Swiss-Prot record:
Its EC number is 1.13.11.12. The keyword Oxidoreductase applies. This is Putative lipoxygenase 5. SMART domains: LH2. Pathway: Lipid metabolism; oxylipin biosynthesis. GO terms for molecular function: linoleate 13S-lipoxygenase activity; metal ion binding; oxidoreductase activity, acting on single donors with incorporation of molecular oxygen, incorporation of two atoms of oxygen. Fe cation binds at residues 559, 564, 751, 755, 899. GO terms for biological process: fatty acid biosynthetic process; lipid oxidation; oxylipin biosynthetic process. Belongs to the lipoxygenase family. PROSITE patterns: LIPOXYGENASE_1, LIPOXYGENASE_2, LIPOXYGENASE_3, PLAT.
């Protein structure tokens, strides 16, 4: 890179205020690298109008001019109602009488006399009226231009929509210039002039660093960035394209009463990442709270962040399932109170079988009077049955075994909390003045008999002791959790021993409650592997509490906070501070698809007060406060990359002799072993890509768009942590490649590992209850006799109720589903995403690396020596296998956080 003043992340204060950025869409793009004549499937080119065939519609090319043509691919809605069809006909008629769509070519060069960009005369898009009845999803229109022979290369196209409706441009290809076809990947909704009188700008696929921007495009680059940043005022309309920041102040609704209010997340009192600003008015009773938009009313995200139709259809089906599965248990339980709890495990099994009681109950006279139920009967066959989760397909009783409980810490849906125990006993970091002595109640006597003849010290020094520690994250909230109806929790620790076979076995579980009164010793109970029938059920209950805490930490912290919320500021900043022409924006673009929309939906129905998360997980109405506590105490970007995270948890040590520079202390740790394959592939890809544009440290430091992106993501997007000393620097190509690797990893592989196994591995509630309703009874408690008398029923009564179970299963069924338009790691459906041959070559090598990683994962899953992923009833670990078909597959690594 050449030119530009030196600036790096070390001088963030200056950088944050003067960057610029470019919004880009998340839409799937056409494969338009072929000549225009070889158009993609389903694209229809209708015959040109008669006038055009006579030559009237095409500008005459003089000897000193160039005749050029723009071929515009417009994607139509698949499903249109009568109102849409009528509006389309009106637009076609308006087009016929001159209210057409106008295109204008902008050269990369400036006029030497005027100093302004060279532009063509506006040209109308031809064929809208003639193709008004075409049924294809993609329809191609053309515009003809005659420009001076010295026009230069087209670097941008402007579009003015004089119709009444918005339309979606997928791509533009401009032909006729000596430099060859110019490709413009658009994937954007263009608003009509009645909404916005500004011309939309689309840049060609040639990447330009800011200092290398051709003279003819500099002004447009600046203007487009300013448009996307907006002015930070006013309420956003759903047609807007503006990206900005706000705190999480719309999760509660204080106008409904104190119980419906929720604290603001973000700010000194409760630090949190920032979310997309909507500018909605405050609530009537609390000026600090933003008024809510309840689902299914649309919540603002930049227009091009909306889902495509295929994604919307998938979520609509999921919404129908939620209605049915939630509505039916509520209906039946209102008539038959005795089935609110599971009477036995057979009731749980019946959820996965055809002919459920819920379905049969539809035939009762009572239900026949309800039109909605009659409609379900007639139209929704198949939506009333849950698929059998993978976790019980191969071995129905595997979940009861200790080895399976331990295996899931390495290869389950939350394999990112297991840590090596480096000192014994474990010690809390909480204030002992408030929470009592920090030492764990687990003693050497509790575990010595389970260490295969080793002493505790030998086991620690030999890296044989591991732990799931949910003590400190839960204990500060336990009083408020346990005060809620039907919710009971502990601060938990589970200690595991690494056997000679390379598998883990649980050897102690500690359940802790806070002190009842000042000076009172808090309750600490330790459970060890059972010796008789009663202790077996106490042990099962203790494991269930560990699993429930694990489920809460997984959803609130590892999944939502780390891969959704903490990524949002980097995405917002990218659109605000980096042009679509910027090579780094082009690299990041597929990894930002759908994330802002998903996060906005989460604020509507998942993480909001009384939403799915609060209703389904033990912490209840303190769920998001726990998430904020974890952000304040635990989150650091420099430890979010896989190698740094493994080292932090003591699961790996640096070893230059190993393929990835790390040696895993549990060799058969499927998440880590497979993750390192993908991490390395992503790292090589980012290094090669960065090297193509940044030959020196100075090139990185002088790129003001790049520096402004990172500075703003930190200073504005993570404002509550902006002064932390651990933020990675952005001063060298190595710094940049490392930062990009971490971000791509979090948006793709890390999110996939934490998301797409939720139903397959968590859909059988006894295996992994998200919510517990009873504490573990002690001998002498009234409940203890109930446990002894009917352990099955007591165990199930501690788990979620039937309604809670079916609601939760429905949600994670939807969350675990790949949509048909998913784009997977290594894929770039838009083959014309860049005109840079070096970048395309690096992308092809990356795709090959990803394929090789998938082949290695398949080999590992077939290796009987890897007992944590292969064996009788053992599920293979495929969550890091990059490819997948649509649906619930328990595999597949999408490019971005798409669900």
């Amino acid at each position: 890179m050449r030119g530009g003043a030196g600036m790096c992340f070390a001088s963030m204060e200056a950088a944050g205020s003067r960057g610029m950025g470019k919004g880009a869409s998340r839409r799937r793009t056409a494969r338009s690298t072929a000549p225009v004549g070889a158009l993609v499937e389903r694209v229809v080119v209708a015959p040109a109008p008669v006038e055009q065939q006579r030559g009237a519609g095409r500008p005459e090319a003089h000897p000193q001019s160039v005749a050029a043509r723009a071929v515009v691919t417009v994607r139509r809605r698949r499903k249109e109602d009568a109102k849409d069809r009528f509006a389309e006909q009106l637009d076609a008629l308006a087009d016929r009488v001159g209210r057409s769509v106008l295109l204008e070519l902008v050269s990369t060069e400036t006029d030497p006399r005027k100093g302004t960009p060279k532009k063509s005369k506006p040209s109308a898009l031809v064929g809208w009226f003639d193709k008004k009845d075409v049924k294809a999803e993609r329809v191609v229109y053309t515009a003809e231009f005659a420009v001076d022979a010295g026009f230069g290369e087209p670097g941008a196209v402007t579009v003015l929509n004089r119709h009444q409706r918005e339309f979606y441009i997928e791509s533009i290809v401009v032909e006729g210039f000596p430099t060859g076809p110019a490709h413009f990947t658009c994937n954007s909704w263009v608003q009509p002039t009645r909404v916005s009188r500004d011309r939309r700008v689309f840049f060609s696929n040639r990447p330009y660093l800011p200092s290398e921007t051709p003279p003819g495009l500099r002004e447009l680059r600046l203007r487009e960035l300013a448009d996307l940043r907006g002015d930070g005022t006013g309420e956003r309309r759903i047609t807007d394209r503006v990206y900005d920041y706000d705190v999480y102040n719309d999760l509660g609704n204080p106008d409904k009463g104190v119980a419906s209010a929720r604290p603001v997340l973000g700010g000194e009192q409760m630090p949190y990442p920032r979310r997309m600003r909507t500018g909605r008015p405050s609530t009537a009773t609390d000026a600090s709270a933003e008024s809510r938009v309840e689902y299914p009313e649309p919540i603002y995200v930049s227009r091009d962040e909306e889902f495509e139709e295929g994604k919307n259809e998938m979520l609509s089906e999921g919404a129908i399932k939620a209605l049915l599965h939630n509505f039916m248990p509520l209906l039946v339980s209102s008539v038959s109170p005795d089935i609110r709890d599971f009477a036995g495990f057979h009731d749980v099994d019946n959820l996965f079988k055809e002919g459920l009681r819920l379905k049969q109950a539809l035939h009762d006279q009572l239900f026949q009077k309800i039109p909605f139920v009659r409609k379900i009967q007639e139209n929704s066959e198949g939506l009333l049955r849950y698929d059998t989760p993978d976790i019980i397909k191969k071995d129905k009783f595997a979940w009861l075994r200790d080895d399976e409980f331990a295996r899931q810490a390495l290869a389950g849906i939350n394999p990112v909390n297991i840590e090596r125990l480096q000192a014994f006993p474990p010690v809390s970091k909480l204030d002992p003045a408030v929470y009592g002595p920090p030492e764990s109640a687990i003693t050497e006597e509790h575990i010595i008999g389970h260490l295969d003849g080793m002493s505790v010290q030998e086991a620690v020094e030999g890296s044989r002791l591991y732990m799931l520690d949910y003590h400190d994250i839960f204990l500060p909230f336990l009083d408020r959790i346990n005060a809620q109806d039907g919710r009971k929790a502990y601060g938990t620790r589970a200690v595991f021993f690494l056997t000679a076979a390379g598998t883990l076995k649980p050897i102690a579980i500690e359940l802790c409650l806070p002190p009842m009164t000042d000076g009172c010793k808090r309750a600490k109970r330790v459970f060890t592997p059972p010796a008789d029938a009663t202790s077996n059920w106490l042990w099962q209950l203790a494991k269930a509490h560990v699993c429930s805490n694990d489920a809460g930490v997984h959803q609130l912290i590892n999944h939502w906070l780390r891969t959704h919320a903490c990524m949002e500021p980097f995405i917002i900043a990218a659109h605000r501070q980096m042009s679509a022409m910027h090579p780094i924006f082009k690299l990041l673009k597929p990894h930002m698809r759908y994330t802002l929309k998903i996060n906005a939906l989460a604020r509507q129905i998942l993480i909001n007060g009384d939403g799915v998360i609060e209703s389904g997980f033990t912490p209840g109405n303190v769920c998001m406060e726990m998430s904020a506590f974890a952000y304040r105490e635990l989150w650091r970007l420099d430890q979010e990359g896989l190698p740094a995270d493994l080292i932090r948890r003591g699961m790996a040590v640096e070893d230059p002799s190993q393929p990835h520079g790390l040696r895993l202390l549990i060799e058969d740790y499927p998440y880590a072993a497979d993750g390192l394959l993908l991490w390395s592939a992503i790292s090589r890809w980012c290094e090669a890509y960065v090297a193509a544009y940044y030959p020196s440290d100075e090139a990185v430091q002088a790129d003001y768009e790049l520096q402004s992106w990172y500075a703003e993501a930190v200073q504005s997007g993570h404002a509550d942590k902006r002064g932390a000393p651990w933020w990675p620097r952005l001063s060298t190509p190595g710094d940049l490649a490392s930062l990009l690797t971490t971000l791509v990893w979090l948006c793709s592989a890390q999110h996939a590992a934490l998301n797409f196994g939720q139903y397959p591995l968590g859909g059988y509630i006894p295996n992994r209850p998200p919510l517990m309703r009873r504490l573990v009874p002690a001998e002498g408690d009234p409940e203890y006799a109930h446990l002894v008398a009917d352990p099955h029923r007591f165990f199930l009564s501690a788990l979620p109720s039937l309604t809670q179970t079916t609601t939760f299963m429905t949600v994670i069924d939807t969350l675990s589903t790949h949509s048909a338009d998913e784009e997977y790691l290594g894929e770039r459906p838009d083959e014309a995403w860049t005109a840079d041959p070096a970048a395309l070559a690096a992308a092809r090598e990356f795709a090959a690396d990803v394929r090789r990683a998938e082949e290695e994962i398949e080999r590992r899953n077939a290796d009987p020596s890897r007992r944590n992923r292969c064996g009788a009833g053992v599920l293979p670990y495929e969550l890091m296998a990059p490819s997948s078909g649509p649906g619930i597959t328990c595999r597949g690594v999408p490019n971005s956080v798409t669900i």
